[in-house]
């Protein structure tokens, strides 16, 4: 990230910096009280903070649910490309919803916020990496609502400041990240087969 964009705290390439709210098309937090819908043989998934880390969403140990057919479920059902950010406990963990996760039928809990961005200007994976950088982490810490129980609200998320390079450069970065991820999978598979 730093090699391509420079240190975001310094912004040596002098990219424009704006509040995230300028690029948010949809913003919601997850559902409370879904324990009654969580079952071992549920047909859909329920994302919690433990699934969101390092700009990714892990399907390992994903909670199974049978979601209700109501407005709350429709509001908290994720779509491909949604950016998820933890807003309680371990603040600022990020992940981007993949096609596989979205197609499975997946919802978020109350400890996460779901953001749909204007993808013509900001790539969600670029934003995830920015938020996981030192510059992003410092903002989460400064906006933390309480010293006793960590938490962020919609205003905190909307007011996050982000460096906005041209979308072509963001896409180049995302292509590189995806290629590295593919290479890691190939190496891991080879290691697993060697054992």
Predicted regions and their residues:
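Low-complexity, Lys/Gly-biased intrinsically disordered segments
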Residues: 13-56, 71-73, 145
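A short beta-sheet element
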Residues: 48, 73-132, 149
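Short, basic/aromatic beta-hairpin or loop at an interaction surface
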Residues: 51-64, 106
């Amino acid at each position: 990230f730093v090699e391509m964009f420079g240190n975001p705290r310094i912004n040596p390439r002098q990219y424009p910096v704006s509040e995230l709210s300028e690029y948010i098309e949809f913003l919601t937090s997850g559902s409370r009280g879904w324990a009654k819908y969580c079952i071992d043989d549920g047909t859909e998934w329920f994302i919690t903070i433990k699934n969101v880390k390092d700009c990714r969403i892990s399907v390992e140990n994903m909670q199974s649910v049978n979601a209700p057919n109501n407005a709350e479920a429709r509001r908290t059902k994720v779509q491909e490309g949604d950016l998820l950010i933890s807003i309680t406990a371990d603040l600022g963990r990020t992940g981007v919803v993949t096609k596989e996760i979205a197609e499975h039928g997946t919802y978020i809990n109350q400890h996460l916020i779901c953001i749909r961005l204007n993808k013509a200007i900001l790539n969600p994976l670029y934003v995830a990496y920015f938020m996981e950088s030192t510059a992003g982490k410092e903002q989460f810490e400064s906006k933390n609502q309480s010293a006793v129980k960590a938490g962020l609200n919609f205003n905190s998320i909307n007011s996050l400041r982000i460096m906005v390079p041209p979308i072509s450069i963001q896409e180049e970065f995302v292509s590189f990240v995806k290629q590295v991820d593919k290479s890691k999978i190939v190496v891991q598979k080879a290691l697993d087969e060697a054992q």
